[in-house]
A protein has these predicted regions:
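An N-terminally biased module of ancient metal coordination in phosphate/nucleic-acid-related enzymes
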Residues: 1-70
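Extended substrate/RNA-proximal surfaces in nucleic-acid metabolism proteins
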Residues: 51-115
Length: 115
């Protein structure tokens, strides 16, 4: 029987393992196919495509909003060289950085008040 794991996060998003370690562990455990679907990132795909002893399906988990709901959409067999995808990922990452900066600013104000 063939097994696959099609929803894995690496340390390029909110996972703890490198893409290399994920692939090595998948091979050791007999998986035939995997997809590293990092949040709003395709960086792990450049590492993953170097392996030919396991089927690595290029994937991503895109964040979006619909009617005040945060949604995550999984995409498989993505073209990591697609310029529109690259621009979208860059916008999402820029947005994330801005949110982090805003959170840090608010936390600094709270810490100052507590001092």
């Amino acid at each position: 029987m063939k097994y696959a794991d099609l929803h894995i996060h690496s340390n390029y998003s909110d996972g703890t393992m490198t893409p290399e370690n994920i692939i090595k562990l998948a091979i050791e455990n007999g998986l035939k196919s995997i997809s590293i679907t990092d949040h709003d990132s395709i960086s792990s795909q450049y590492v993953a495509k170097k392996y030919d002893n396991i089927n690595v399906i290029p994937g991503i988990e895109l964040s979006t909003e619909y009617e005040d709901l945060e949604l995550h959409i999984l995409g498989y067999f993505i073209d990591i060289n697609n310029q529109n995808l690259m621009k979208t990922v860059e916008k999402l990452n820029q947005s994330r950085l801005e949110r982090v900066e805003e959170i840090i600013f608010k936390l600094q104000k709270i810490i100052y008040i507590l001092q």
